[in-house]
Amino acid sequence: MKLRPLHDRVVIRRSEEESKTAGGIVLPGSAAEKPNRGEVVAVGTGRILDNGEVRALAVKVGDKVVFGPYSGSNTVKVDGEDLLVMSENEILAVVEG
């Protein structure tokens, strides 16, 4: 199944983070914080402005992004994989390089 977000929404695959502390202690799944990085897998058509025009999104499929800890509260399961759906304005930065 393919997910196509609407308007200014973005679908993100959360990155897998290491579940070890700097000291080498392995954290159980419940103690580890969810990573706040991911890869954009789908983008909507753009944000609808007050004058009716559509502004294209600044992120594109394949971008590695950073988002806030409470961003992407909408999680959907597609083909057994949990994906986040969030508005573009919830993305804090694009990781380059």
Curated annotation (Swiss-Prot):
Gene name of this polypeptide: groES
Swiss-Prot/TrEMBL keywords: Chaperone, Cytoplasm
Function recorded in the entry: Together with the chaperonin GroEL, plays an essential role in assisting protein folding. The GroEL-GroES system forms a nano-cage that allows encapsulation of the non-native substrate proteins and provides a physical environment optimized to promote and accelerate protein folding. GroES binds to the apical surface of the GroEL ring, thereby capping the opening of the GroEL channel.
Pfam families with a match to the protein in the record: Cpn10
NAD in keyword set: no
Localization per Swiss-Prot or TrEMBL: Cytoplasm
SMART domains per UniProt: Cpn10
Gene source species: Pseudomonas putida (strain W619)
Entry protein name: Co-chaperonin GroES
Gene3D superfamilies: GroES chaperonin
Family, as annotated: Belongs to the GroES chaperonin family.
Molecular function terms, GO-annotated: ATP binding; metal ion binding; protein folding chaperone; protein-folding chaperone binding; unfolded protein binding
InterPro entries associated with the record: Chaperonin_GroES (IPR020818), Chaperonin_GroES_sf (IPR037124), Chaprnonin_Cpn10_CS (IPR018369), GroES-like_sf (IPR011032)
Biological processes annotated in GO: chaperone cofactor-dependent protein refolding
